[in-house]
């Protein structure tokens, strides 16, 4: 599992061009209906989702086998977590987790 940094971008098409043409990333997945793209360059992976950019910038995206069990485990340990969200069309489940300084990390499970 490779960590992926996700950015919310206002214009997915412009951002896709920037990462491919300007920074040399290769796009390995895109969903025009859900408005997201996944790109990689070497060991670096970047995900782009169309939406309003977040105040805190990028989100570290970490793949896990079972988001629901991770949510239960982390809550039991007293870690601040959000709610498990299933992406429409059953593509993946995500969970926002916060480190001791309030930095957001997103756990994700492909379905």
Label each region the model flagged.
Residues 4-6, 38, 45, 58-61, ...:
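Short aromatic/hydrophobic contact patches that present stacked aromatics
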Residues 1, 52-57, 88-89:
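Short glycine-enriched loop/turn motifs at secondary-structure junctions
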């Amino acid at each position: 599992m490779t960590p992926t940094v996700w950015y919310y971008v206002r214009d997915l098409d412009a951002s896709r061009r920037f990462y491919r043409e300007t920074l040399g990333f290769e796009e390995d997945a895109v969903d025009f209906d859900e408005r997201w793209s996944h790109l990689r360059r070497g060991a670096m992976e970047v995900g782009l989702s169309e939406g309003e950019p977040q105040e805190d910038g990028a989100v570290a995206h970490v793949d896990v086998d079972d988001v629901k069990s991770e949510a239960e485990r982390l809550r039991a340990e007293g870690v601040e977590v959000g709610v498990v969200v299933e992406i429409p069309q059953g593509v993946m489940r995500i969970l926002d987790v916060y480190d001791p300084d309030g930095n957001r990390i997103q756990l994700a499970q492909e379905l």
